[in-house]
Amino acid sequence: DKSISAIGNIGKPVLDFLDQKIDIAIIEISSFQIEASSRLESEIGILLNIEEDHIDRHKSFEIYKSIKLRILQESNFNISKLEHKIAGKEFYDYENYFPESRFLNNPALKEWPIHDVFNLKACLSALKFILEDKENLQILDVNDFLDKAIGIIASFEKLPHRFEVLENVNGITYVNDSKATNFDATLKSIESSRNLNKQGNIYLICGGDLKEQNLENKNAAIFKDIKKCFIYGKDKGSIKESLSHFTNCVLCADLDSAYSLAKKESQIGDIVLLSPACSSTDMFEDYRERGLRFKELVKRS
C-alpha cells in the first residue's frame, strides 16, 4: 500500500508534512507559491490552464504565464493541453488521450461541470503514468482502465463551493460556484449550467475584486446565455460596463441584495448561479465565507 496525501494550496500547508513519510504527495501550488520557490523538481507536472488572473500581484499576463509554466519546465513528466513546446519539452496531451466521447458515454459523469471533466482527464493521465512507469503495470485496455477509475472517482464527495448544486427550492435550482474567482472560471460555470438545464433561464450573481483582469479579451458573448446578471462588490461598475452589451445587468449593494433580486425574478425551471468571477476579499474573508453566505440565503428560502 502507498501513502498518498493531497496537500498545498487546497488548505493543508506542505511544511506541515515535512516530517511525515509520504510515498506520493499531490501538491496544488499557486502562482504566488511558485514565484517564491527557487525550484520545484516534481516527478509529474500538471498544468490545467493558463488564464488571466492575479494581475494585481504579477503586473502582467506575460509574467503570470511565465510563472505558471515553471510547473512544466521543472518537472520530469508533463501533463497539459497546451499546443506547443516549452523549453524543448513535449507534453502529454490529456485531451487527445481521453477524448470527449469516452466521457460523455459514462452516466456517472453526466452532471459533472466541464472543468471537473478536464481535471479528471489530467488526473487519469497522471495515474496511468504512475502505474505504467513506476509500478511496471501495463494498461492494455484503456477503456477498462477508464471505467474502473471513473467508477471509483464518481463515488467521492465533491468539495464545496465548486459548482455545488444546492437543493431545488420551489422549482428553482441554486448553484454555489464561489470558487470561481476569475472570469474564465465563470465562463465555464455558465456552460456547465446550460448543460445542467437546457431550457430554463440562468440568473447570474457575480462581483467582487476583479484583480485587474482585462475583460476586453474575454469571450463575453457567452453571457448572452444569461437572462439577467446581478452585480455587487468593489468593481461592479467595470463589470457592468463590459457585460451590459450582452445581457441585462443590475447593480446591487451586496450579495444578500443580489440574491434577493435573483430569487424574486426567477421562476420554476430556472437556475440562480453564484459564480463571482472575482476575488471575495472586498466583502468576505475568502471564497469559502462567500459560498457559505450564499448557502445560508438559499437555506432560508
Question: Each predicted region: which residue ranges?
Answer:
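Flexible active-site lid/hinge loop adjacent to a nucleotide/diphosphate
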Residues: 10, 19-113, 281-283, 287
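Walker A (P-loop) phosphate-binding motif
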Residues: 1-9
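Short glycine-rich anion-binding loops that position phosphate/pyrophosphate groups of nucleotides
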Residues: 31-33, 52-53, 84-85, 181, ...
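C-terminal helical cap/extension that packs against the catalytic core
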Residues: 214-270
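Nucleotide phosphate-binding/pyrophosphate-handling subdomain across enzymes
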Residues: 112-226
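Glycine/aspartate-rich loop-and-adjacent alpha/beta segment that forms the canonical ThDP
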Residues: 277-301
